[in-house]
């Protein structure tokens, strides 16, 4: 899917170097089709890196995706230039009267922070409530899953003693589910989280359908039956080097982190890691865009009435 972004966004050149099809706004304006409108609420500190990761996954289909970047944290960023945020991000007040085909809420490094201590917790709740009436389908990633489960279902925060970091095996539970269509029976995906997602807890608190689990019984991929919300507890968007960057950052900070599981060749951090989850990540996002967004979203977004027909 050619992603449609502003001509000056740094991701344009970065992704083109990877042979990813990026369509700038100036070129897209000449095509007489309605693009899918996808809003990305980027909660990660290194926003440009995260933009590249998600835009890459949204790019592989013949339909246009018009991407809008959203921020809700008004504090000065230490990792992203203010000029970049001012040029390419909108505030919630700018888009609250609009409707969108899809919304992606990224993870955030807040696993050890209580929800009420998160600086923008009220804004998170506001966006999730707004999305019920203004977005066809929302995809939550990693920490955003934990936040959404608390806001939407009242599930208390579950925190692991040690951080889960590495590339783990998962298995699908419903081979014919649309979101897992084309998945291998077992597949790899990276995790980097303190949050805990026991499948039994999610079944007890919600009517969400768990579609894939880790080998230890943690929920990895689950969704509502009406396709309006979907959750992925790992990081299928991560680059090959992302877990390594996090690991060496924590080493330098004196945190004595565990070496990410099943990640470095021969479990040696001096060896260059390889991405073993790219095909899974691409297929997951393609399925979400096709079956959870495109096939149920209304043609006229002024009348938000998703249908399963």
From Swiss-Prot:
The record marks 192 as: Important for substrate specificity. InterPro entries: Class_I_gatase-like, HST_MetA, MetA_family. It catalyses: L-homoserine + succinyl-CoA = O-succinyl-L-homoserine + CoA. Signal peptide: none annotated. The keyword Cytoplasm applies. The record marks 111 as: Important for acyl-CoA specificity. The keyword Amino-acid biosynthesis applies. Keywords: Acyltransferase, Amino-acid biosynthesis, Cytoplasm, Methionine biosynthesis, Transferase. One of its GO terms (cellular component) is cytoplasm. Pfam families: HTS. It is an enzyme of class 2 (transferase). CDD domains: GATase1_HTS. Pathway: Amino-acid biosynthesis; L-methionine biosynthesis via de novo pathway; O-succinyl-L-homoserine from L-homoserine: step 1/1. The active site is at residues 142, 235, 237. One of its GO terms (molecular function) is homoserine O-acetyltransferase activity. GO terms for biological process: L-methionine biosynthetic process from homoserine via O-succinyl-L-homoserine and cystathionine. Its EC number is 2.3.1.46. Its main location: cytoplasm. It is found in: Cytoplasm. Substrate binds at residues 163, 192, 249. PANTHER family: HOMOSERINE O-SUCCINYLTRANSFERASE. Belongs to the MetA family. Transfers a succinyl group from succinyl-CoA to L-homoserine, forming succinyl-L-homoserine. This is Homoserine O-succinyltransferase. It comes from Citrobacter koseri (strain ATCC BAA-895 / CDC 4225-83 / SGSC4696). The gene is metAS.
């Amino acid at each position: 899917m050619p992603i449609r972004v502003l001509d000056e966004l740094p991701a344009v050149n970065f992704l083109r170097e990877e042979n990813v099809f990026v369509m700038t706004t100036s070129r897209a304006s000449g095509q007489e089709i309605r693009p899918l409108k996808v809003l990305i609420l980027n909660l990660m500190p290194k926003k440009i890196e995260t933009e590249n990761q998600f835009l890459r996954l949204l790019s592989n289909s013949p339909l246009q995706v018009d991407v809008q970047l959203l921020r809700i944290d008004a504090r000065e960023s230490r990792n992203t230039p203010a000029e970049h945020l001012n040029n390419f991000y909108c505030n919630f007040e700018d888009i609250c009267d609009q409707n969108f085909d899809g919304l992606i809420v990224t993870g955030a490094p807040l696993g050890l922070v209580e929800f009420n201590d998160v600086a923008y917790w009220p804004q998170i709740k506001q966006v999730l409530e707004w999305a019920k009436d203004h977005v066809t389908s929302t995809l939550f990633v990693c920490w955003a899953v934990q936040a959404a489960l608390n806001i939407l279902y009242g599930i208390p925060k579950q925190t692991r003693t040690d951080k889960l970091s590495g590339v783990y095996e998962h298995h699908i539970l419903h081979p014919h589910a649309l979101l897992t269509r084309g998945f291998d029976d077992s597949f790899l995906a990276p995790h980097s989280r303190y949050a805990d997602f026991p499948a039994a807890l999610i079944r007890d608190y919600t009517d969400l359908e768990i579609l894939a689990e880790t080998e230890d019984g943690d929920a990895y991929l689950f969704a509502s039956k009406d396709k309006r919300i979907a959750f992925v507890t790992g990081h299928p968007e991560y680059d090959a080097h992302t877990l390594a960057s996090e690991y060496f950052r924590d080493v330098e900070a004196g945190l004595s982190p565990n070496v990410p599981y099943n990640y470095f060749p021969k479990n040696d951090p001096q060896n260059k890691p390889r991405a073993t989850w790219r095909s899974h990540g691409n297929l997951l996002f393609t399925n979400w865009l096709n079956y959870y967004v495109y096939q149920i979203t209304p043609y006229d977004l002024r009348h938000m009435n998703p249908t399963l027909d």
